[in-house]
Regions:
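A compositional/biophysical signature of low hydrophobicity enriched in polar/charged and small residues
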Residues: 1-117
């Protein structure tokens, strides 16, 4: 499974409702992640620009996007972002592919690389 960071904030209305009835936000995130075929690995409250950070394991990008859209459609969140996390091993593989891609790339206005149109 792939890991995703789900980051964002609550609206003023959502904060007001949670103050009146705190509930269990971790259980709510666990439930939505499970419904999309994933699982919640970690959940943190934060302060500053964002109010929470959830680390979710999901089988694929589509499942992670489904979680993000499901919670985003509630109207209780602001500045919701879902970020695909890359392990150090995956990062090494990305850099290896980037090396080959860089050799084939021609920036705008530059002469195209040999054999590439």
């Amino acid at each position: 499974m792939a890991k995703f960071a789900v980051i964002g904030g609550y609206t003023a209305e959502a904060w007001s409702k949670m103050i009146d009835n705190p509930g269990d936000r971790v259980a709510a995130v666990q439930k939505v992640a499970h419904a999309a075929g994933g699982k919640l690995e970690q959940f943190f409250w934060s302060f500053g620009d964002d109010d929470y950070l959830a680390i979710i394991d999901a089988p694929d990008d589509i499942s992670a996007a489904a979680v993000s859209i499901a919670v985003g459609s509630s109207g209780s969140l602001r500045n919701l972002r879902t970020i695909r996390l890359i392990t150090p091993e995956e990062g090494r593989q990305v850099l290896e592919k980037a090396k080959a891609a860089k050799a084939a790339y021609s920036p705008p206005g530059a002469k195209a690389a040999a054999g590439v149109r």
